[in-house]
């Protein structure tokens, strides 16, 4: 099942200068009420599935599709709602309902910063929260401070597993986010859970070698570009947190061909 579209626990966050809780605006209260209402309307189906959220400035949809294919290769029933653009609360909860009816036990969803800021994901049980990257601000992207503030709404929802990019320039800020059960990282650093050892870029694809402890494995994708290596590593880290073998990870990533993806 594939869709394509154009709370507060502060112990892991930087301490504020004041102990006073920030005042919730009327707009935010309305957004949260709408999210709760839609969840109830559809019978709160996400409680019977595991929710994987991928956020970041770029690559969210690519990582989500990689994870979708990996889970399929692992024999899981999985639905994906993937876009590098925005997402509406009504669309998200309808997706959960249809995924549940289709028998899915995993939902993989992209979580853009504006949707997080607008409380689209309010009240949801997050199994995995993964961060791709933060690119330098432009006319269409927020500052690091506002981006971090938006992203924190996802990581304050007590995700069981957190996946972070050690190669990102803002990793020192994001490293404050930890999972209630597990935290994994990926990148070229020796300390990364999934370490990027080397990569080869071709005209019609990308190949990369990774390490998971003493286990070495290779992934190849139809997608091209240096950033694809990081996206594969992110997907591999998410899959590793779900106890999926490296062979299955490689198979799933190889199976993703964007030309074959159709909207459900």
Spans of model-derived segments:
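Acidic, Mg2+-coordinating active-site environments of NTP-dependent enzymes
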Residues: 47-49, 102, 108, 125-264
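Phosphate- and divalent-cation-binding pockets in alpha/beta enzyme and binding domains
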Residues: 62, 66, 115-117, 170-174, ...
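ATP-dependent NMP and nucleoside kinases share a basic, alpha-helical "lid"
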Residues: 116-128
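Conserved nucleotide-sensing/catalytic segment adjacent to the nucleotide-binding pocket
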Residues: 89-115, 119
């Amino acid at each position: 099942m594939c869709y394509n579209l154009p709370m507060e626990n502060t112990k892991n966050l930087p301490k504020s200068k004041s102990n006073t809780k920030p005042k919730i605006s009327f707009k935010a209260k309305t957004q949260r009420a709408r999210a709760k209402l839609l969840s109830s309307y559809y019978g709160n189906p996400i409680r019977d599935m595991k929710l994987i959220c991928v956020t970041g400035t770029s690559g969210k949809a690519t990582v989500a599709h990689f994870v979708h294919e990996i889970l399929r290769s692992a024999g899981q029933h999985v639905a994906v709602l993937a876009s590098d653009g925005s997402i509406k609360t009504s669309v998200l909860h309808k997706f959960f309902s249809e995924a549940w009816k289709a028998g899915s036990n995993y939902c993989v969803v992209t979580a853009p910063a504006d949707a997080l800021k607008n409380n689209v994901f309010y009240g949801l049980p997050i199994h995995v929260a993964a961060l791709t990257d933060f690119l330098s601000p432009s006319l269409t992207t927020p500052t690091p401070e506002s981006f971090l503030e938006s992203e924190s709404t996802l990581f304050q929802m007590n995700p069981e597993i957190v996946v972070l990019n050690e190669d990102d320039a803002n990793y020192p800020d994001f490293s404050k986010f930890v999972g209630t059960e597990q935290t994994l990282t990926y990148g070229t650093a020796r300390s990364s859970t999934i370490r990027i050892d080397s990569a080869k870029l071709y005209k019609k694809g990308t190949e990369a070698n990774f390490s998971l402890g003493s286990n070495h494995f290779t992934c190849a994708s139809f997608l091209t570009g240096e950033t694809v290596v990081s996206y594969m590593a992110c997907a591999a880290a998410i899959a590793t947190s779900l106890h999926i073998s490296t062979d299955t990870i490689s198979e799933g990533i190889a199976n993703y061909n964007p030309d074959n993806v159709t909207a459900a």
